[in-house]
Amino acid sequence: MLVAGFLLALPPSWAAGAPRAGRRPARPRGCADRPEELLEQLYGRLAAGVLSAFHHTLQLGPREQARNASCPAGGRPADRRFRPPTNLRSVSPWAYRISYDPARYPRYLPEAYCLCRGCLTGLFGEEDVRFRSAPVYMPTVVLRRTPACAGGRSVYTEAYVTIPVGCTCVPEPEKDADSINSSIDKQGAKLLLGPNDAPAGP
Protein backbone atom coordinates (compact mmCIF):
# COMPACT_ATOMS: atom_id res chain seq x y z
CA MET A 1 0.00 0.00 0.00
CA LEU A 2 2.83 2.41 0.86
CA VAL A 3 4.55 1.76 -2.46
CA ALA A 4 1.31 2.30 -4.37
CA GLY A 5 0.61 5.50 -2.49
CA PHE A 6 4.13 6.76 -3.13
CA LEU A 7 3.87 6.11 -6.86
CA LEU A 8 0.46 7.79 -7.00
CA ALA A 9 1.95 10.86 -5.33
CA LEU A 10 4.53 11.17 -8.11
CA PRO A 11 3.86 12.87 -11.46
CA PRO A 12 2.46 10.50 -14.12
CA SER A 13 5.74 10.57 -16.03
CA TRP A 14 7.57 9.25 -12.94
CA ALA A 15 5.15 6.40 -12.32
CA ALA A 16 5.28 5.37 -15.98
CA GLY A 17 9.04 5.25 -15.83
CA ALA A 18 9.24 2.82 -12.89
CA PRO A 19 11.94 0.19 -13.60
CA ARG A 20 11.59 -3.55 -13.73
CA ALA A 21 13.14 -5.65 -11.00
CA GLY A 22 16.55 -7.12 -11.64
CA ARG A 23 18.01 -4.21 -13.62
CA ARG A 24 21.15 -2.45 -12.42
CA PRO A 25 20.54 1.02 -10.98
CA ALA A 26 23.02 2.73 -13.32
CA ARG A 27 22.09 6.24 -14.40
CA PRO A 28 21.29 6.39 -18.15
CA ARG A 29 23.46 8.69 -20.23
CA GLY A 30 21.94 12.17 -20.40
CA CYS A 31 19.66 11.55 -17.41
CA ALA A 32 20.14 14.18 -14.70
CA ASP A 33 19.57 13.59 -11.02
CA ARG A 34 16.61 15.04 -9.16
CA PRO A 35 17.12 18.37 -7.36
CA GLU A 36 18.25 17.99 -3.76
CA GLU A 37 15.27 19.99 -2.49
CA LEU A 38 12.78 17.68 -4.20
CA LEU A 39 14.49 14.54 -2.86
CA GLU A 40 14.40 16.02 0.62
CA GLN A 41 10.67 16.72 0.29
CA LEU A 42 9.91 13.19 -0.89
CA TYR A 43 12.06 11.68 1.82
CA GLY A 44 10.41 13.90 4.43
CA ARG A 45 6.96 12.65 3.42
CA LEU A 46 8.01 9.02 3.73
CA ALA A 47 9.85 9.47 7.00
CA ALA A 48 7.22 11.82 8.46
CA GLY A 49 10.02 14.10 9.62
CA VAL A 50 11.22 11.75 12.37
CA LEU A 51 13.90 9.91 10.45
CA SER A 52 14.98 13.13 8.78
CA ALA A 53 15.71 14.64 12.20
CA PHE A 54 17.49 11.42 13.21
CA HIS A 55 19.65 11.66 10.09
CA HIS A 56 20.69 15.27 10.67
CA THR A 57 21.41 14.99 14.40
CA LEU A 58 23.61 11.90 14.09
CA GLN A 59 25.80 13.11 11.25
CA LEU A 60 29.39 13.33 12.39
CA GLY A 61 31.90 16.07 11.75
CA PRO A 62 35.20 15.30 9.98
CA ARG A 63 37.18 15.23 13.25
CA GLU A 64 34.76 12.88 14.99
CA GLN A 65 34.58 10.57 12.00
CA ALA A 66 38.37 10.36 11.69
CA ARG A 67 38.89 9.62 15.37
CA ASN A 68 40.15 6.09 15.98
CA ALA A 69 37.69 4.85 18.60
CA SER A 70 38.58 1.82 20.72
CA CYS A 71 37.05 -0.13 23.59
CA PRO A 72 37.24 2.12 26.71
CA ALA A 73 37.67 -0.83 29.12
CA GLY A 74 38.56 0.32 32.64
CA GLY A 75 38.94 3.87 31.45
CA ARG A 76 37.75 6.75 33.60
CA PRO A 77 38.15 10.41 32.65
CA ALA A 78 40.89 12.17 34.60
CA ASP A 79 38.75 15.31 34.81
CA ARG A 80 35.52 14.50 36.63
CA ARG A 81 33.91 17.55 35.09
CA PHE A 82 34.22 15.86 31.70
CA ARG A 83 31.14 13.73 31.02
CA PRO A 84 31.43 11.50 27.94
CA PRO A 85 28.38 11.09 25.70
CA THR A 86 25.89 8.33 26.47
CA ASN A 87 27.19 6.01 23.76
CA LEU A 88 30.62 5.96 25.46
CA ARG A 89 29.26 5.60 29.02
CA SER A 90 27.23 2.50 28.14
CA VAL A 91 28.36 -0.97 29.28
CA SER A 92 28.22 -1.74 25.55
CA PRO A 93 29.83 1.42 24.15
CA TRP A 94 29.50 2.26 20.49
CA ALA A 95 30.62 4.86 17.98
CA TYR A 96 29.29 6.05 14.64
CA ARG A 97 30.60 5.89 11.11
CA ILE A 98 29.07 7.41 8.00
CA SER A 99 27.72 5.15 5.25
CA TYR A 100 27.78 6.75 1.79
CA ASP A 101 25.77 5.55 -1.21
CA PRO A 102 25.43 7.87 -4.25
CA ALA A 103 22.35 5.96 -5.48
CA ARG A 104 20.48 6.47 -2.19
CA TYR A 105 18.83 9.41 -0.46
CA PRO A 106 19.93 10.35 2.13
CA ARG A 107 23.34 9.64 0.59
CA TYR A 108 24.98 9.85 4.02
CA LEU A 109 23.61 7.75 6.88
CA PRO A 110 25.14 7.31 10.35
CA GLU A 111 25.68 3.68 11.38
CA ALA A 112 26.58 2.57 14.89
CA TYR A 113 29.23 -0.06 15.58
CA CYS A 114 30.22 -1.70 18.87
CA LEU A 115 33.59 -0.75 20.34
CA CYS A 116 33.96 -3.80 22.61
CA ARG A 117 33.57 -7.52 22.07
CA GLY A 118 32.34 -8.07 25.63
CA CYS A 119 30.57 -5.73 28.07
CA LEU A 120 32.11 -3.31 30.58
CA THR A 121 30.38 -4.85 33.60
CA GLY A 122 33.44 -5.21 35.84
CA LEU A 123 33.72 -3.35 39.16
CA PHE A 124 36.03 -0.76 37.62
CA GLY A 125 34.63 -0.94 34.10
CA GLU A 126 36.65 -3.95 32.99
CA GLU A 127 35.51 -5.89 29.95
CA ASP A 128 33.66 -9.14 30.72
CA VAL A 129 33.67 -11.59 27.80
CA ARG A 130 30.94 -13.70 29.40
CA PHE A 131 28.67 -11.10 27.83
CA ARG A 132 28.64 -9.78 24.31
CA SER A 133 28.07 -6.32 22.85
CA ALA A 134 25.51 -6.67 20.07
CA PRO A 135 24.24 -4.03 17.63
CA VAL A 136 20.64 -2.82 17.84
CA TYR A 137 18.95 -2.36 14.47
CA MET A 138 16.14 -0.04 13.42
CA PRO A 139 14.10 -0.22 10.22
CA THR A 140 14.11 2.93 8.13
CA VAL A 141 13.01 4.11 4.72
CA VAL A 142 15.22 5.60 2.01
CA LEU A 143 14.84 6.66 -1.60
CA ARG A 144 16.67 4.43 -4.08
CA ARG A 145 17.63 5.65 -7.55
CA THR A 146 16.48 3.33 -10.34
CA PRO A 147 17.73 2.88 -13.93
CA ALA A 148 14.58 4.56 -15.27
CA CYS A 149 14.64 8.10 -16.63
CA ALA A 150 11.54 10.29 -17.00
CA GLY A 151 11.61 13.80 -18.40
CA GLY A 152 15.40 13.76 -18.40
CA ARG A 153 15.52 13.02 -14.65
CA SER A 154 16.28 9.87 -12.68
CA VAL A 155 13.36 8.05 -11.05
CA TYR A 156 13.49 7.18 -7.34
CA THR A 157 11.46 4.59 -5.45
CA GLU A 158 11.15 3.92 -1.73
CA ALA A 159 13.16 1.12 -0.15
CA TYR A 160 13.21 -0.22 3.40
CA VAL A 161 16.51 -1.02 5.10
CA THR A 162 17.73 -1.73 8.63
CA ILE A 163 20.58 0.27 10.11
CA PRO A 164 22.46 -0.22 13.41
CA VAL A 165 21.64 2.64 15.80
CA GLY A 166 23.41 1.50 18.99
CA CYS A 167 24.67 -1.49 20.98
CA THR A 168 23.35 -3.48 23.92
CA CYS A 169 24.76 -6.12 26.27
CA VAL A 170 23.57 -9.71 25.86
CA PRO A 171 24.75 -12.96 27.50
CA GLU A 172 26.93 -15.26 25.46
CA PRO A 173 25.23 -18.42 24.14
CA GLU A 174 25.00 -21.30 26.65
CA LYS A 175 27.49 -23.37 24.66
CA ASP A 176 30.22 -20.77 25.22
CA ALA A 177 29.22 -20.35 28.87
CA ASP A 178 29.44 -24.13 29.45
CA SER A 179 32.88 -24.17 27.83
CA ILE A 180 34.09 -21.40 30.17
CA ASN A 181 32.67 -23.16 33.25
CA SER A 182 34.25 -26.46 32.19
CA SER A 183 37.64 -24.77 31.81
CA ILE A 184 37.33 -23.17 35.27
CA ASP A 185 36.39 -26.53 36.85
CA LYS A 186 39.43 -28.24 35.29
CA GLN A 187 41.77 -25.53 36.56
CA GLY A 188 40.28 -25.84 40.05
CA ALA A 189 40.79 -29.61 40.04
CA LYS A 190 44.46 -29.19 39.10
CA LEU A 191 44.98 -26.85 42.04
CA LEU A 192 43.44 -29.36 44.48
CA LEU A 193 45.60 -32.25 43.25
CA GLY A 194 49.32 -32.34 43.96
CA PRO A 195 51.90 -33.04 41.26
CA ASN A 196 52.16 -36.71 42.36
CA ASP A 197 48.45 -37.19 42.92
CA ALA A 198 46.35 -39.08 40.46
CA PRO A 199 42.62 -39.67 40.29
CA ALA A 200 41.53 -42.80 42.12
CA GLY A 201 40.75 -45.79 39.93
CA PRO A 202 37.31 -47.45 39.85
From Swiss-Prot:
Gene Ontology cellular component list: extracellular space
Keywords: Cytokine, Glycoprotein, Secreted, Signal
Species this chain originates from: Homo sapiens (Human)
Role, per record: Induces expression of IL6, CXCL8/IL8, and CSF2/GM-CSF from endothelial cells.
GO molecular function term, any single one: protein homodimerization activity
SUPFAM superfamilies xref list: Cystine-knot cytokines
Segment forming the signal sequence: 1-15
Gene3D superfamilies with a match to the protein in the record: Cystine-knot cytokines
Family membership: Belongs to the IL-17 family.
Free-text tissue specificity from the UniProt record: Expressed preferentially in adipose, skeletal muscle and CNS.
Cross-referenced InterPro entries: Cystine-knot_cytokine, IL-17_chr, IL-17_fam
Protein name: Interleukin-17D
Gene: IL17D
Residue ranges of the region described as Disordered: 65-85
